[in-house]
Amino acid sequence: MDITPALTEMELDHKPTCETVPGLPQKKHYRQRAHSNPHSDHDIEYPLTPNHMDWTKYYGDYTKGRQVDFADIGCGYGGLLMRLSPKYPDNLMIGMEIRVKVSDYVNEKIQALRKHHAEAGHYRNVAVLRSNAMKYMPNYFHKGQLSKMFFLFPDPHFKNKKHKWRIITPTLLSEYAYVLREGGIIYTITDVKDLHEWMVKHLSEHPLFERLTEEEMKKDPIVEMLFESTEEGQKVTRNDGGKWPAIFRRLPNPAL
């Protein structure tokens, strides 16, 4: 059977996280509603400032000489993180997830993968924390700390009165611009055309972001991972749905 290099690479990407790894949690025990109200009181602990954040609780001594610089916002069951981790072993990456059971699942999965690959030291660069990124992003990250931020299949909040709850808004984009370094990248993808247009509109109108061209997107190896790495993306594929990516670059601050 003829197998293309792209397919072989995809199989290799998924091999380390397959169900044959001992101790992997079963997703059926960690099911929770697809989205959570970001404005509810979730009793979440968070650091007073980034200086109060102890990342060694998540990465151990792997933090030596490193800072977290990839952030997957609303990481779900961690599919993208598991794809990114072995490809970018020198980058610390964090998944931020508001749902308790889902973040517990991702943590258990990471611990199982670390144990299984202990000799090689794989997956030490990935972690998850339960938090509300819409409220506490600046509490975790210093100015210009992040190089990449991911927003994959976020809650569309269809009703007009709930659009203010969307993860991409003018106010939130200013916070993202604060923690994202110049030249850093925001990756978005959704299966909801209206939400795609909303995100593109607000990112395009913000003075600190510019959209990547089609040619630039083709050269970025991460872009292809956005489509199928997550459970939500795979579900959209099974249902023959459309997917719309939009990638933006953080521009330099304007001269004073």
Curated annotation (Swiss-Prot):
Gene Ontology, cellular component aspect: nucleus; tRNA methyltransferase complex
Stretch list, region Disordered: 17-45
Active site (catalytic residues): 155
Catalytic activity line of the entry: guanosine(46) in tRNA + S-adenosyl-L-methionine = N(7)-methylguanosine(46) in tRNA + S-adenosyl-L-homocysteine
Main localisation: nucleus
InterPro entries for this protein: SAM-dependent_MTases_sf, Trm8_euk, tRNA_(Gua-N-7)_MeTrfase_Trmb
Binding site for S-adenosyl-L-methionine: 74, 97-98, 132-133, 152, 230-232
Broad enzyme group: transferase
EC numbers for this chain: 2.1.1.33
GO biological process, one term: tRNA modification
GO molecular function: tRNA (guanine(46)-N7)-methyltransferase activity; tRNA binding
Keyword annotations: Methyltransferase, Nucleus, RNA-binding, S-adenosyl-L-methionine, Transferase, tRNA processing, tRNA-binding
Residue stretches of biased makeup (Basic residues): 26-36
Pathway: tRNA modification; N(7)-methylguanine-tRNA biosynthesis
Localisation: Nucleus
NCBIfam families: tRNA (guanosine(46)-N7)-methyltransferase TrmB
Role description: Catalyzes the formation of N(7)-methylguanine at position 46 (m7G46) in tRNA.
Family that this chain belongs to: Belongs to the class I-like SAM-binding methyltransferase superfamily. TrmB family.
Name of the molecule in the record: tRNA (guanine-N(7)-)-methyltransferase
Gene name per UniProt: metl-1
